[in-house]
């Protein structure tokens, strides 16, 4: 990383540099656009261009100062047509008060005042100049400044501030938006000083696949407990001891009580010794009709 030209108080912390490297913000593509050469550190033997992380940090601070200079946060429009950046722009908008356009950008948002979605922002921030080309083109028609996350192969036409970073990985995109939001809050005074940690974790800015999350929940609900889990549950509830050959205290009590009751009933019936048929049969020489009570005649 090249030496920074920033004042010492704005220098990145070792944790910030580790996060940028872990999210692979320094890995560009194999193609290089001529206007992105100043942000290039070197090219690896496999052809991948490596971005200078120091330049990335400097541009994040510059973009944050521009954003903090706008009085009304709602006049800032953050845009991402790329799925990996949609969650990040929504979180950025909720934390800074900006207006988010996540998904398809409707043509005419900045130029056609008849449409309901017409907007007049003072600044727009896009995730990828290639996928958000329509927004940049319309911004150029109405003189709106543009901040963009630019990879080594990104076109920089009509881009006023380019933040050199990997804009194709979900972790890299989420981390840059998170760092940008944190610096904006620091400059606005929401965070007391630069030593104050932001309580929002960077994971909230990462893209999550809805189908993968849904399948994960379904798999957890339909998961069949294994033998180890069943055994552990039985030991905790007291129905089985740690040694399966030896019953725990109280184990099998319902079965023992039922067996004892059955044995007692069988003993009492055998002791009676009487003939059930004899007790219900009429005496000899009498008919069934004679044994029935006679009804009173009126």
Swiss-Prot record:
Cytoplasm in keyword set: yes
A cellular component term, taken from the record's GO annotations: cytosolic small ribosomal subunit
Region called Disordered, residue ranges: 240-298
InterPro entries: Ribosomal_uS2 (IPR001865), Ribosomal_uS2_C (IPR032281), Ribosomal_uS2_CS (IPR018130), Ribosomal_uS2_euk (IPR027498), Ribosomal_uS2_euk/arc (IPR005707), Ribosomal_uS2_flav_dom_sf (IPR023591)
One Pfam family it belongs to: 40S_SA_C
Family annotation (PROSITE patterns): RIBOSOMAL_S2_2 (PS00963)
Keywords, comma-separated and alphabetical: Cytoplasm, Ribonucleoprotein, Ribosomal protein
Keyword Cell membrane set for record: no
One GO BP annotation of this record: ribosomal small subunit assembly
Low complexity bias: start-end ranges: 248-271
MF GO annotations: structural constituent of ribosome
Residue ranges with Polar residues bias: 289-298
Subcellular location(s) per record: Cytoplasm
Domain of life: Eukaryota
Chain's role: Required for the assembly and/or stability of the 40S ribosomal subunit. Required for the processing of the 20S rRNA-precursor to mature 18S rRNA in a late step of the maturation of 40S ribosomal subunits.
Family of the protein in this entry: Belongs to the universal ribosomal protein uS2 family.
Entries under PANTHER family matching the protein: 40S RIBOSOMAL PROTEIN SA (PTHR11489)
Quaternary assembly: Component of the small ribosomal subunit. Mature ribosomes consist of a small (40S) and a large (60S) subunit. The 40S subunit contains about 33 different proteins and 1 molecule of RNA (18S). The 60S subunit contains about 49 different proteins and 3 molecules of RNA (25S, 5.8S and 5S). Interacts with rps21.
Name of the molecule in the record: Small ribosomal subunit protein uS2
Annotated organism of origin: Aspergillus clavatus (strain ATCC 1007 / CBS 513.65 / DSM 816 / NCTC 3887 / NRRL 1 / QM 1276 / 107)
């Amino acid at each position: 990383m090249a030496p920074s030209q920033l004042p010492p108080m704005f220098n990145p912390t070792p944790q910030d540099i580790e996060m940028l490297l872990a999210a692979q913000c320094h890995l560009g593509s194999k193609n290089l656009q001529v206007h992105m050469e100043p942000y290039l550190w070197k090219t690896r033997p496999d052809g991948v261009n490596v971005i200078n992380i120091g330049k990335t940090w400097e541009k994040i601070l510059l973009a944050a100062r521009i954003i903090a200079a706008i009085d009304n946060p709602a006049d800032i429009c953050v845009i991402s047509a790329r799925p990996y950046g949609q969650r990040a722009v929504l979180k950025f908008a909720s934390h800074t008060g900006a207006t988010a356009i996540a998904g398809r950008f409707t043509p005419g948002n900045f130029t056609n005042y008849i449409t309901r979605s017409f907007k007049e922002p003072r600044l727009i921030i896009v995730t990828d100049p290639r996928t958000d080309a329509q927004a940049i083109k319309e911004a150029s028609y109405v003189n709106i400044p543009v901040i963009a996350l630019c990879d080594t192969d990104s076109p920089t036409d009509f881009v006023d501030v380019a933040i050199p970073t990997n804009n194709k990985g979900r972790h890299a995109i989420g981390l840059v938006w998170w760092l940008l939001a944190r610096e904006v809050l620091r400059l606005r005074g929401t965070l007391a000083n630069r030593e104050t940690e932001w309580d929002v974790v960077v994971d909230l800015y990462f893209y999550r696949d809805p189908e993968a999350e849904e399948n994960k929940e379904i798999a957890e609900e339909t998961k069949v407990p294994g033998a180890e889990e069943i055994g552990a549950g039985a030991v905790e509830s007291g129905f089985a001891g740690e040694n399966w050959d030896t019953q725990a205290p109280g184990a099998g009590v319902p079965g023992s009580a039922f067996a004892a009751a059955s044995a007692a009933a069988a003993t009492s019936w055998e002791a009676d010794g009487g003939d059930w048929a004899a007790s219900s049969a009429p005496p000899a020489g009498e008919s069934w009709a004679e044994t029935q009570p006679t009804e009173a005649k009126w």
